[in-house]
Amino acid sequence: MKQKIKSRLKKDNWLRYLSQTVAVCFLLLFISFFIFLLIEAAKTGPDFTKSLLGLEFNLGAKKASIWFPLLVSFVVSIGSLIIASYIGVRTSIFLVYRCKPRIRKKLLLVIDILSGIPSVIFGLFATQILSSIFRDVLHLPPLSLLNVIVMLSFMIIPIVISLTTNALLHVESSLMTVAISLGENKTSVIYKVIKKEIKAQLVVILVLAFGRAISETMAVNFILQSVNYQEVIANDRFFTSDLKTLGSVISTFIFSENGDEQVSGVLYTFGIIIFVLISFLNFFAIWSTRPKTLERYPFLKKISNFIYQVVWFIPNNIGALFTDLTARRQQVKKITAANVEQRATFFKERMQTNHLNKVYTSWKILQEIFCAVLAFGFVLGILLFVFINGSQAIQRSGSTVFSFGVDTTGRALVNTLVIILVAIGITFPIALLIAIWLNEYTKSRIAKNTFSFVIDSLSSMPSIIYGLFGLSFFLRTLQLSAGGANGTSLMAGILTISVVVLPFLIRTCQEALNNVSWDLRVSAYALGVSKREVIWKIVLPGALKGLIIALILTINRIIAETAPFFITAGLASSNLFDLSLPGQTLTTRIYGQLFSTNSTAVDVMLETALVSIVFLMFLIFLSSYLIPYLFSFNKQKWLQIKSKLQLWKKA
């Protein structure tokens, strides 16, 4: 009897020990990630180290001031954040309060498409379309910081819209009902009550969107080319210049011909600065909005208010002007027997107030419609640009979509598919085990908070930092390349992208497990079912739909990435196909054409962009429609379909 109990305990505990071991290894990965960055950054020479806090940037002269690239990064990020927050929040209000749920669901799918578009396609659109608008319509330099601000604003709009929409949908409906019953109109309630109710969430959204903007690298490289910071700033042409951001400086000089070990150390130092900055922003956003934190540190409310006021300075002042114009200033508040002779004045003032309230409401709705048209119009514009021009490029004689040679789009697609299959095979079991341990086994709040912070930090990490880690660890240390420490390989790209998507996959798997009703677990435990059996027979089957969607979203993320592959897998494919040899993906094929002197470079970009967009739209269709539709079928429906198929075969 004792032996049976022991054997059953061993069977029950093996999953716990395995998942716990994998979780600890993941934590060690995070620590080693930072250590390898520090080791490479330590190679910075004394001359470069002294110049980091100086005001001169010239890598050839061993001058590497951090301030100018960081200033450019902050300026373009704040500029894009102001535009994106204005458009995004008003579009969210339009979706939640002006659209029916069915229409809202379809429009949010369009936003999902925008969020899934690879950054290199944004860069291509900016150089081909936005640059023409700046040059021909606005009569401004086509490739400038202003172009980058507009491009980045539409890149971060999906974050603002999706998170703000989610926050608005979770506001208690009683707030709207009570305020309207007190005499306020719907629009006034939205902007004066509900918007203030989600103010804390809006600050978090702004911080997350800012982190996304400041970490963008590859799209920015399509536009910004200069590092002559002192000359440009001295000539007072900052916004019309093409000065590089901090992230684009890293990607530009990481494989520079004149780059040595010290230059590489400087770039790793820049990467650590971005890493620390993004981690701090995410930690501050989550920590500062907790009720207990706000009670203990009241000054955090002032900081949140300051961030909110800076970003919303112009919209708030315009809104305050209209509020002032439409404010009630009735001299006669109420008609009684004592002032019945003033009834004419009372009705006149009330009609004027109602008219001004209608003006206020119309102005707000007009802004919402305008912002929604801008957001969805941009998606339509970029899709039409890719489909029309990409289709024309494919029809030309030089198209390589259906070729699989060395320098072809077909070969890039094959490389991308191989990377997806191997990376998913590596990351999914690891992510699922960690999610099971966090969700089903561990009871420690400290452990959960620690892993939550690590996962959030790694999820928000700029992909260029992962590329630096892959270069340092997989190529220079493990030498997973046929070319040795100085080479690139598909295997290094696969392992690097596995590290990139692992935190995202852990979080989505955890959400899928959380969506399984806890009542099912409790009922099973009450019947004497072991935890291992509950996980295998109840939790995992119940979470199957969410896990499949998590896999599809992860594949989407892999396709959209560029920076990790650019650094670890290379910009070109080798003559032979081998995981130890370099190979370009769809996105690095687009990016690689920036350095090509071939006259067909733009056509190659367009045809590859079309293949990428079609692939991504297919995945979004799977995750948003097909998978939920299939899982909505019950057993009886499947039997009906089976019987119809059998009858069809007999006929």
From Swiss-Prot:
Subcellular location: Cell membrane
Predominant location: membrane
ABC transmembrane type-1 domain span: 70-285, 413-623
UniProt keyword list: Cell membrane, Membrane, Phosphate transport, Repeat, Transmembrane, Transmembrane helix, Transport
TM regions (residue ranges): 22-42, 64-84, 107-127, 143-163, 203-223, 266-286, 368-388, 417-437, 451-471, 486-506, 535-555, 613-633
GO cellular component, one term: plasma membrane
Matching Pfam families: BPD_transp_1
Entry keyword annotation includes Metal-binding: no
A Gene Ontology biological process term: phosphate ion transmembrane transport
GO molecular function, one term: phosphate transmembrane transporter activity
Membrane topology: Multi-pass membrane protein
Job of this protein: Could be part of a binding-protein-dependent transport system for phosphate; probably responsible for the translocation of the substrate across the membrane.
Family: Belongs to the binding-protein-dependent transport system permease family. CysTW subfamily.
Entry protein name: Phosphate transport system permease protein PstA homolog
The species this protein was found in: Mycoplasma pneumoniae (strain ATCC 29342 / M129 / Subtype 1) (Mycoplasmoides pneumoniae)
